[in-house]
Amino acid sequence: MLNFFAAAPKGFEYSLAQELTEFGATEVKESVAGVYFTASLALAYRITLWTRLASRIVLVIYKGSCESAEQLYNAAYCVDWPAHFSNKSTFSIDFHGTGGFLNNTQFGALKIKDAIVDRFRDDDIERPNVSRVDAEFKVDAHFRNGVITIAMNFSGPSLHQRGYRSTTGEAPLKENLAANMLVRSGWQASPSTLLDPFCGSGTVLIEAALMAADIAPGLQRSRFGFEHWRRHDKAVWQEIVEEAKARASLGVKRCEIKFYGSDIDSRLVALAKRNAENAGVLELIEFKVADALTIAPPAESGYLITNPPYGERLGNVSELLQLYYQLGDKFKKEFGGWKVAMLCSDIELVSSLKLKADKQMKMFNGALECAFNIYTLHANSTRRDTPVLPDGVDIADIAPAFANRIKKNAKLLEKWAKKEGIDSYRIYDADIPEYNVAVDKYLDYVIIQEYMAPATIPEAVTKRRLSDVLLALPSAIGINPNKMIMKTRERQKGTSQYQKLDERKLELITTEYGAKFKLNLTGYLDTGLFLDHRLTRRLVGQKSKGRRVLNLFSYTGSASVHAALGGAKSVTTVDMSNTYIAWAKDNFALNGLQGKQYEFVQSDCMQWIRDCNEQYDLIFIDPPTFSNSKRMEDSFDVQRDHVNLLASLVKLLSPTGELVFSNNKRKFKMDIETLTKMNINVTNIDDVTLPMDYKRNPHIHNTWLITHA
């Protein structure tokens, strides 16, 4: 009898142990990411050909304690390597594990390589060559807790590679993971009609058809690790292969199970058909292009086993939440008598099904931890009695307090926005503390920004509430889910407002009191326009006629545009970011503003103020709450530094000039006493700069008008 280890993804151990036991293996023992077992050579061949779950089978050649580099070398040297492989075969060592004397896997591999080469030489045999790529004989070594295990890769390339897959879709599912889904769902034990409405490249259905038709998953593999093993028995192996071929031919003819697969992507359906044809099971599976939400049950009962899209895989989160909710509704109403088994990594999406799982287990899709949930759907079951809205989501069922509040806000603010001449505004700002989000409308898009929840609230609770928000929004305000954009921000985190998110651009043009501005809804945490400063920008425009205007920390220059449109004699726009200076220039061009009177300066604003010798009639400054950019000489804290900042700016003001100063620090306290002693007048103008859509959050910013005394 020989000792083996069958490796598999984490979470497969129980299923794999059961499979090996059914094959007839003995001394079956589960371990981390695999199972140890004992088998004859013939049984090992059979397991390698027929296992649907293992990723790799290795033959254990040596196992013992190891406490030094010398002991590691000796352990490898004592193996009779010339009896295992020819010196004409190339070899490689795959070493895993560190600890104690061994802190480098390359060193471990090198010691074993030296021992193998020396063993050949000491037996008066020319040494074999090492090949880093595609070696013919592969040694697997594992070092853990002072024990070294040296093995031969018996199976060869990963066993999940059956040989039928031509190419993959965007989010391929490994074949042995699909097989484990079929095993753990209970389908393999009692096969019946099987449906996969998100079939992708067909992996779940093909693996199921291979099971039902008694086809060995390894039949189409062209290479096995034991082929260059000197103790390989070709006759025994060939007998096992021929038996499997005969069973496959008979199994396809006898198979009476019905398989149905569909996907909304016609390209993937075509790929699934090619893969099924390669696997020899195309005649058993009915594929079609269809939306999962329109699929009717193909039988009175059966299994629906699928790997639907989720966050790490495909799709937009708000669209996916809607999809899962509607799937749950469809399953309840139309699939009574069926079992549903779904693989998903996102707990929010799973909970959006609104179904109670019979079983919940963990599986790993590569490195991604997923939930595999199994549901039993009872006949004539409905989720609720209240009517479902056209988009499939009933407001009464999802976050009713939030849905009703934002619906009311949206209706009121839409009329107001039309009168104001704006098309971008806030419709919700954590009005209800449990739903701690801000929702901004930009033309026909909305951006949902989740505030950081207090540490006292469990993460599962905040995730549940957020998914409820995303589910309720489309019906509540009449928005298409694919025009919902989700962002996360923390309150008062310095320059986080300028953080770049990704390279994608979703650009729109918004209108504000006659001015036009370019928005980027996806590239950055903010969009290019701070909506809460809308009235402040208009105020700057109203005060600009015939005046020399300076805009510091200008961001995308929106206040500068209002100043120019307001008739400013000149406008100087200063920001440290080249990106935002370029954006400001785009905004000027968008409004037909050009000329030498409009100056754009990329500079550290604090240093620019110190170096400036010009006079201005109107200055607008909206500095960050805190900044320690590498491009600035010193850090800046608006509370700590505002007196010195304002004193420096007043020096740049003409005798009748005005300074509009604003910031977003929620607990900001203006040092009026010190500024008054410096002959500086300070007047709070929050009441005239807070827009209607921000009345629910009066501390969003504070604004001050400053002049010479």
UniProtKB/Swiss-Prot annotation:
Keyword list, A-Z: Cytoplasm, Methyltransferase, RNA-binding, rRNA processing, S-adenosyl-L-methionine, Transferase
Enzyme class: transferase
Family annotation (SMART domains): THUMP
Ranges where the THUMP domain occurs: 43-154
SUPFAM superfamilies noted in UniProt: S-adenosyl-L-methionine-dependent methyltransferases
Any Pfam family: UPF0020
Source taxon at top rank: Bacteria
Record localization: Cytoplasm
Assigned EC number: 2.1.1.173, 2.1.1.264
Cellular component terms per the entry's GO annotation: cytoplasm
Disulfide feature: none
Molecular function terms from GO: 23S rRNA (guanine(2445)-N(2))-methyltransferase activity; RNA binding; rRNA (guanine-N7-)-methyltransferase activity
Reaction(s) catalysed (UniProt annotation): guanosine(2445) in 23S rRNA + S-adenosyl-L-methionine = N(2)-methylguanosine(2445) in 23S rRNA + S-adenosyl-L-homocysteine + H(+); guanosine(2069) in 23S rRNA + S-adenosyl-L-methionine = N(2)-methylguanosine(2069) in 23S rRNA + S-adenosyl-L-homocysteine + H(+)
Main location: cytoplasm
InterPro entries: 23SrRNA_methyltr_KL, DNA_methylase_N6_adenine_CS, RlmKL-like_Mtase, RlmKL-like_Mtase_CS, RlmL_1st, SAM-dep_methyl-trfase, SAM-dependent_MTases_sf, THUMP_dom
PANTHER family: RIBOSOMAL RNA LARGE SUBUNIT METHYLTRANSFERASE K/L, RIBOSOMAL RNA LARGE SUBUNIT METHYLTRANSFERASE K_L
Function, as annotated: Specifically methylates the guanine in position 2445 (m2G2445) and the guanine in position 2069 (m7G2069) of 23S rRNA.
Similarity comment: Belongs to the methyltransferase superfamily. RlmKL family.
Protein name: Ribosomal RNA large subunit methyltransferase K/L
